[in-house]
Amino acid sequence: MDSIVQDAIDEAEESEDSASEPADVAGGGGDTVPTGTMTDNELEDVLQELQTNITVVGCGGAGSNTVDRMATEGIHGADLVAANTDVQHLVDIEADTKILMGQQKTKGRGAGSLPQVGEEAAIESQGEIRDSIAGSDMVFVTAGLGGGTGTGSAPVVAKAAREQGALTIAIVTTPFTAEGEVRRTNAEAGLERLRDVADTVIVVPNDRLLDSVGKLPVREAFKVSDEVLMRSVKGITELITKPGLVNLDFADVRTVMEKGGVAMIGLGEADSDAKAADSVQSALRSPLLDVDISSANSALVNVTGGPGMSIEEAEGVVEQLYDRIDPDARIIWGTSIDEQIQEEMRTMVVVTGVDSPQIYGRNEAAEGDGPAQESTPEPEPEPQAGSEIEDIDYVE
């Protein structure tokens, strides 16, 4: 399959191990910008004030692996935080900030695949978590759902980020069927909790990756999953922080992602003569995007190409999407330039307000205001992180 998923497989097979700069363009929404004749230094000061502060928090093993891959790959304009209960794993991760969660609870030995322990560890370390995301305009929370630390801690981190006023986007994987029913049940509970506290939850179903990674060894299949998480976060972040033919700012991304609910992502690439059409078709046929996008209420599109990419090529990608999505849906798109890409074009499509058989939880209830609101009466008081969703239990 000619897609970024295939590219991720190539990365995983090649190696076991496989800087940030200030944002070039960012939007602050409500900031007052001085007008009139200004010097270059004064303009630089204004640009610094408008800079969007983005933080990526990797929770647990899979989330920390995502952060590590982003540090290796290089991400433009984001701070990287790795948060885990396993000190041995954390030592090997590259990140701007590392948080060993729940030292008293776990002694650095991990959560034992128990989400309850991961949640308690994150609550114990809420001070460090809040410090690591302080001042952020947008926070990505990445995790692999189904295990202990990522499943339990990701909702706590997302809740803290949203309470501090950040646009909060969770990007998570759901487990392979072969991982067992316990992990699937815990992933469902973790996803439900994330839906209550994050603005948007982008779900990457590992089962759908089997279409591409079925013949790979198990360890490399998980590396592909980590790679897809990394590329998803990087693609959204660099829409804001990297210059392109069509630039987006933070306000644009907030328009789609704020209260976006559950979202799915498609990744595609092409280097053919008709690469614009082929890359978007590859993204829409991606096994990760197992939805009927015609019912989506909004979409965020990132088109990445080399220095020779034309505005006509980028527009061709978006025109293809307009033909397939609800005419009333809001589509926000931008481009970024990657000097390392020659003739290729990459397309990332995030669609929100969708239903999919690959998504666990209350899809049906989420569509109607009545039942969904009645089933979650606790969020109003907000006594402490994690307690607003006590009705959904993890299993051991």
Curated annotation (Swiss-Prot):
GO terms for molecular function: GTP binding; GTPase activity. Residues 1-38, 358-396 are annotated as: Disordered. Its main location: cytoplasm. Residues 8-19 have a biased composition (Acidic residues). NCBIfam families: ftsZ. The keyword tRNA processing does not apply. Essential cell division protein that forms a contractile ring structure (Z ring) at the future cell division site. The regulation of the ring assembly controls the timing and the location of cell division. One of the functions of the FtsZ ring is to recruit other cell division proteins to the septum to produce a new cell wall between the dividing cells. Binds GTP and shows GTPase activity. FtsZ1 rings form just prior to cell division events. It comes from Halobacterium salinarum (strain ATCC 700922 / JCM 11081 / NRC-1) (Halobacterium halobium). This is Cell division protein FtsZ 1.
